[in-house]
Regions:
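Short, small-residue-biased leader/transition segments that mark boundaries at the very start
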Residues: 1-6
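Transmembrane beta-strands of outer-membrane beta-barrel pores
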Residues: 8-14, 49, 63-69, 116, ...
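Outer-membrane beta-barrel translocator domains and adjoining extracellular loop/strand segments
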Residues: 10-25, 71-78, 134-143, 195-200, ...
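Residues on the lipid-exposed face of transmembrane beta-strands in outer-membrane beta-barrel proteins
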Residues: 10, 43-47, 110-114, 124, ...
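Predominantly the C-terminal beta-signal and adjacent terminal strand-loop region
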Residues: 31-37, 68-70, 80, 98, ...
């Protein structure tokens, strides 16, 4: 079995090919397509209150609107005779069936961050994506022709994500280079939103550690080189456990890098 997936500016094409060494067996090709042109709306609010002279607390909430995005998903099944090369094609939805629509879920998030004198920051985020209310087209080979490619209400389940992180900076305005380095660490846990053969998909557990190195010169004192290492564990009881180790490097620019110079 071979699979190929192509995404291009809202166009989605996924091809699955089943071929056999037996020359008397027909090869089977399934081609899933969809075309999406739509919008996504995100809203958020944030409030910061000072707890004391050196301590402050920031809380925030986010909301993403879930709605139908169309797409008109279609399936084309091609059965090819390996000896003669003659192909038989069946396209879904069948004539007389309604066009199907894809959708994105409602998403709700909330979090807080505690800041002690810009030396210690601790934050926690929670995000809920309501995938259980989203339907998805599924092909069933053992169903009647009219029920072979239809919207499935049990394809997904709600996704929960929990994130905890901290940042320590000994002295942000110190003349010492070492004391200006920001040390960061975090963990996250994500529940699966996929239902695989009636069971849960893989759960994700990750941990990361890194630091931000200040870049200092005559005209720039706020740009930071960010380096971090991340371990990600994907685990599902019925499938292979996957462990991934990543190294991330990024650069936060000072806005003065983009200022236009003027000569008077």
């Amino acid at each position: 079995q071979r699979q190929m997936c192509i995404r291009d500016r809202g166009n989605y094409t996924r091809t699955v090919v089943n071929s056999y060494t037996n020359s008397y067996a027909n090869s089977l090709t399934k081609r899933y397509t969809a075309e999406v042109r739509n919008y996504k709306l995100d809203f958020g609010a944030q409030y910061t209150t000072r707890l004391s002279k050196k301590d402050e607390l920031t809380v925030g909430v986010t909301y993403s609107l879930g709605h139908d995005i169309g797409g008109n998903p279609m399936l084309e099944i091609v059965s090819t005779n390996s000896q003669t090369g003659v192909a038989d094609t069946t396209s879904y939805p069948l004539a007389g069936q309604k066009n199907m629509k894809l959708a994105i879920p409602h998403s709700i998030g909330a979090g807080f961050m505690y800041n002690h004198n810009n030396k210690l920051k601790i934050g926690f985020d929670y995000n809920l994506q309501k995938w259980a209310s989203v339907s998805f087209p599924v092909y069933k080979a053992d169903a009647t022709p009219e029920q072979s490619y239809v919207m499935n209400d049990n394809a997904f389940k709600d996704r929960h994500k929990f994130t905890l992180g901290t940042e320590i900076c000994p002295e942000e305005d110190s003349r010492s280079f070492i004391k200006r380095i920001k040390y960061r660490a975090g963990v996250s846990y994500v529940t699966p939103y996929l239902n695989v053969d009636g069971g849960d998909g893989p759960k994700e557990l990750s941990a990361s550690f890194g630091f931000g190195i200040p870049i200092m010169n005559s005209y720039n004192s706020r740009s930071i080189l960010n380096i971090s290492a991340q371990w990600v564990n994907l685990k599902c009881n019925r499938f292979v456990t996957e462990n991934t180790f990543r190294i991330n490097i990024g650069l936060t620019f000072n806005e003065r890098w983009f200022a236009k110079w003027k000569v008077e």
